[in-house]
């Protein structure tokens, strides 16, 4: 199996070729926040790897930030996961996501164990700078849609 050697936050490691930066960082205990796996239908947001941009990292020699969930590790790559530039980008992305999110956290069934809420808190977001009209989406009331609020377990 072919491997590549890289450095993440001053820790050198070797990973199989094709490993993403997110996977490599996780393998050495470095947490990079990501929302790729979250179900964000209530935001009307299709959450595919690389779409949310919360997991961006700085790669030495590149001008732009890269989504760690999509960027494969390359030989000699040097990655920084928590620089001021990275943190500011994550805050901006999170504020943009939250600006179109219903502000009903206190009455939400996920309150207290919501990854979105926890990430906003860890990034120090107390208010949203981006104001404006929220997106409006037609509610699908067809009989084939299962309404979770109607299911009692």
Spans of model-derived segments:
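Extended, non-catalytic structural segments that build the interaction scaffolds
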Residues: 9-11, 148-149
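N-terminal cofactor/phosphate-binding cores enriched in small/glycine residues
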Residues: 13-75
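A generic secondary-structure micro-motif detector
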Residues: 11-12, 106
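Fe-S ferredoxin-like electron-transfer domains
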Residues: 53-150
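A generic structural signal for ordered alpha-helices
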Residues: 2-3, 47, 71, 133
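Eukaryote-biased recognition of intrinsically disordered, low-complexity regulatory segments
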Residues: 1-9
